[in-house]
Amino acid sequence: MIEVENLYFDYTDFKGEKIELLKDISFKIESKERVVLLGVNGSGKSTLLKILNALVFPKRGSYIYKGMRIRKRGFKKISRSFRKDISFLMQDPNMLLFNATVREEIEFGLREFGFDDIEKRVEETAKRFGLEKYLETPPFYLSGGEKQRVALASLVAIEPEVLLMDEPSANLDPPTTEWLMDLLRELDITTVISTHNLALAQKFGDRALVLSDNHTLLFDGLLKEFLKNEELMGEAKLLHRYG
Ligand SMILES: Nc1ncnc2c1ncn2[C@@H]1O[C@H](COP(=O)(O)OP(=O)(O)OP(=O)(O)O)[C@@H](O)[C@H]1O
Ligand SMILES: [Mg+2]
């Protein structure tokens, strides 16, 4: 479903120097796989997710989604079906909330993609996400965890095939994190989730992609194998000295 091959991404910093952020990254993700993306701060996780969501494009190498090469040139032609298929819960939910009320927030995507019975879908989604009492509230007033839930509700309402999530548990308390995991299990769609929470990672998915701090792909395989391998964990700088 998702094929990334020899992908490179760089940017030019304020001194005019080229900084490589993703180097020679290759992996494949099959439909309905649940993949956990690990790596230290700045290793490139969010950037990789942005590439998978076609918010930025690779500098070299390829990203192929359902057999289509995703690149800047010609993206407009497929952007509508691509955006219906792939949803991205960004690291900061504020980036995703721009409507006057929670109701309008959930309605937005449903309208955009021409769903029928929008009212009914909004009610159902609100119920599923425990947002009924906030439907007329401006998202602006909500707590971080509640905003996260609204952002996720708006994305899931349009029934995407792929859900990309950047640190989804960062704002969530333990019961809401548990609820998120149940939801992901129930959704049963392709998911790629970046997280720093190794204790929870295994509940999010079985497979891990691990970026090293030199921006290459250090590991692609079973998450439980990675967590057992102290040498690799050390190389990824994901071991705690105070444990
Ligand atoms: N266009 C750009 N201009 C300047 N700096 C950039 C640009 N794009 C990315 N960066 C830098 O690249 C680095 C990698 O960013 P990214 O957000 O992908 O890392 P991350 O693995 O998600 O980190 P975190 O765990 O902190 O969320 C960061 O240091 C960021 O500041
Ligand atoms: Mg990030």
Where are the predicted features?
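Conserved beta-strand-loop-alpha-helix hinge in the C-terminal portion
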Residues: 215-239
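H-loop/switch region of ABC-family ATPase nucleotide-binding domains
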Residues: 195-196
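Conserved ABC ATPase signature
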Residues: 138-142, 146
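Conserved ABC ATPase "signature" region
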Residues: 117-134
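Catalytic Walker B motif of ABC-type/P-loop ATPase nucleotide-binding domains
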Residues: 163-166
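Helix-to-loop junction immediately C-terminal to a conserved catalytic motif
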Residues: 53
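Conserved ABC transporter NBD signature motif
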Residues: 61-72, 82
